[in-house]
Amino acid sequence: MMDPIHQFNIEPIFTIGHIGGQEIAFTNSSAYMFLAVALTSLLMLGTGRRLVPGRMQSIAEISYEFVADTIRTTAGKEGMKFFPFVFSIFMLVTVSNLVGIIPYTFTISSHIIVTAALAFLVFFTVLIYGFYKNGLRFFKLFVPSGIPVVILPLVVTIEVISFLSRPVSHSVRLFANMLAGHITLKVFASFVTMLGAMGIVGVFGAVLPLALVVALTALELLVAFLQAYVFTILTCIYINDAIHPGH
């Protein structure tokens, strides 16, 4: 059976240069990041503005309205100033997840360094804007209203720890789900290949694993969208905390 972890290896494509004796290379991960951005740009810029939209234009409009409605629901109208930021994250995660389902491709969201970079980008955006807009009133985020003074120090400590751990939970959730899903797919696909190589008996034995691979692929399609949605809605919730820290 082929190593199910091999699909996550980062391989250099060509060397860009050296900094401090360290090789700086353009990798397969970098290539698929560029691909995700290129596909998103093609979808959003390559579609027309026809009165009767085609398939690509419909997908672009649905994506736009979906993210816009999510922001309005969680962060209000004021949160719409973050629409370009949130929409970019949503499309990057969605497209990279979908591309990763295609056999022999690379899933950038299955690497913790990528999801952590996105999570910390959200975290510092919220932190900087929260202090920029509210000043010291941003600390109200850590003091829930109606809390008795006796337990206030404990609650504040818990809230601060919870806030600081956001990038960890935000990134690990996406990374772990994509990693586990792709490993499972690889394992069952390997079973199909091995049984099929055993001849007529193996072909019949491969029917069940093949059916499971098809079912798991369909499930991974759902997970690809679901994880992008979860990552996006958490981003919107955190942005709402920066806009309305006292709520």
From Swiss-Prot:
Gene Ontology molecular functions: proton-transporting ATP synthase activity, rotational mechanism
Organism: Nitrobacter winogradskyi (strain ATCC 25391 / DSM 10237 / CIP 104748 / NCIMB 11846 / Nb-255)
Descriptive protein name: ATP synthase subunit a
Gene from which this protein is expressed: atpB
InterPro entries membership: ATP_synth_F0_asu, ATP_synth_F0_asu_AS, ATP_synth_F0_asu_bact/mt, F0_ATP_A_sf
Domain of life the protein comes from: Bacteria
Main location: membrane
One Pfam family per UniProt: ATP-synt_A
Disulfide bonds: none
